[in-house]
Amino acid sequence: MILTENKLKELTLAADVLSEAHRQTRFFSTGQQASVFLSHKHDEISQLKRVAYILEELHASIYVDWLDNSMPPKTSGPTAAIIKQQIQKYDKFILVATNGAIDSKWCNWELGYGDAQKFDLGKIALFPIAQNDNNWKGSEYMQIY
């Protein structure tokens, strides 16, 4: 299912209702709270915040790289090393798959690394979001998620 930006706004508003309906299912069968590495395009903050809100209402613990104080101020090799550590640390990997994120080299790099770490465990997913014209690029390989 591909979401439009308008539909994402509607879902954000409905997250409170979803939260109440799913309070009893906030933990996985292991009894641990879900933790999610959230990959996203940095200039698409609005979409990221809405997706993060929905996941937090479902009681997931979220990692967003630009909120991490240990990140270097300028993108570098150490940036990639920290991202790799965080992808390994968090239980699940979700790409906020906007058209911009699909075009982003960093998002694709993160998706590739996340795939290597999480795919066999079934703990990787896309959160596809189309612009309101319902045009979502996607890539053929993204169909496996």
Which residue ranges define each predicted feature?
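Conserved N-terminal substructure of TIR/SEFIR domains
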Residues: 1-90
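Cross-kingdom TIR/SEFIR domain
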Residues: 2-14, 56, 76-145
